[in-house]
A protein has these predicted regions:
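A short catalytic or substrate-binding loop motif that flags glycine-/basic-rich loops and adjacent residues
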Residues: 8-11, 37, 99-101, 263-264
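Loop/turn elements at helix/coil->beta-strand transitions in domains of secreted/extracellular proteins
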Residues: 24, 51-54, 122-127, 208, ...
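Extracellular and analogous surface-interaction loops
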Residues: 14-25, 44-52, 108-121, 272-277
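GGW-centered surface loops in extracellular recognition modules
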Residues: 1-33
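Glycine-rich strand-loop-strand elements at beta-sheet edges
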Residues: 31-111, 135-165, 208, 213-243
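Chymotrypsin/trypsin-fold serine protease catalytic domain
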Residues: 105, 110-116, 121-194
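Extracellular low-complexity, Gly/Ser/Thr-rich intrinsically disordered linkers
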Residues: 186-277
Length: 277
């Protein structure tokens, strides 16, 4: 380990960090993402004395479906994927694929707890949030990247007929942002389907975790395979300098070196680096 460099991974728990010496530290967070849509990135600098504790919660990747069962949401706010319908158009038993779980956010704060425990005091106790990406539905990976000041919107894809003519254009839901979303710290569960539908019997993806979690529209019937929206990020400029939150459809540094466009197909990450004494 490089002196003054600390990298934290997802352990499904809140980790405590105490600065080994007083000085200025750079904080970096990455939200979890799936194979198609990336988590966001947030960073900022803070001066710490050696007695100050920070609490880091690294978001987990949402799980893929297990047959008709929707995947579990990722640690720290990812919404569960919706279950697929178990009946076809003729009323016979048939299992349709479930949606994947939304991905968890990564955050750093001055007290312990998952992100949803900061709702009442986030302006004074929460330093950074990197939003998690939304989960996907069968054949629909949507736009649900993690935030950024705004997460990617929940989406359903355009539908074409057999001749290639556009029948139904893409449709987008409401994005999570700095002031609203599904819930503070939590993405919405994907819709569980109870009946057959053309491109609508499969479970919808869960919303990503974030300052405000992403939505997953609660619709069923034809053309309702929604990919969940991403959660929003947050950088507390009152407590940090050089603070910024960047959406997961943008190029930014990777926790493994180099650059990446969204934090894809991975749990979140957190790096704390001492930059001056």
């Amino acid at each position: 380990m490089i002196a003054g460099y600390f990298q934290l991974i997802c352990t499904q728990s809140v980790e405590e960090f105490t600065a080994p010496v007083a000085g200025e530290y750079k904080l970096q967070c990455w939200g979890a993402g799936n194979s198609q849509k990336g988590g966001g990135y947030s960073y900022g600098d803070i001066t710490l004395i050696s007695s100050i504790k920070l609490y880091v919660c690294v978001g987990g990747q949402g799980k893929n479906h297990n047959g008709y069962k929707g995947g579990l949401g990722g640690y720290n706010g990812g919404g569960k994927g919706g279950d697929g319908s178990r009946i076809n158009a003729f009323g016979n038993a048939h299992d349709y694929i479930g949606g994947s779980g939304g991905n968890g956010a990564t955050h750093i704060g001055f007290h312990t707890g998952l992100l949803n425990k900061f709702e009442s005091d986030y302006k004074t106790q929460l330093l950074l949030v990197a939003g998690g990406a939304g989960g996907f539905s069968q054949g629909n990976y949507g736009l649900g990247f993690g935030g950024g000041s705004e997460g990617g919107k929940p989406a359903r894809i355009e539908i074409y007929d057999s001749s290639g003519t556009l029948m139904i254009p893409s449709q987008y839901g409401t994005s999570a942002n700095q002031n609203s979303g599904y819930k503070f710290g939590e993405g919405q569960q994907g819709m569980t389907k109870s009946k057959h539908g053309n491109s609508g019997a499969e479970g919808s993806g869960g919303g990503g975790g974030g300052l405000y979690g992403g939505f997953s529209p609660q619709e069923e019937g034809d053309y309702t395979n929604w990919a969940g929206g991403g959660g929003s990020g947050y950088a507390n400029s009152s407590l940090l300098t050089n603070a910024m939150t960047i959406a997961g459809d943008t190029n930014f540094p990777s926790p493994y070196g180099g650059m990446e466009k969204g934090h894809l197909d991975d749990d979140g990450a957190c790096i704390v680096t001492q930059i001056s004494f």
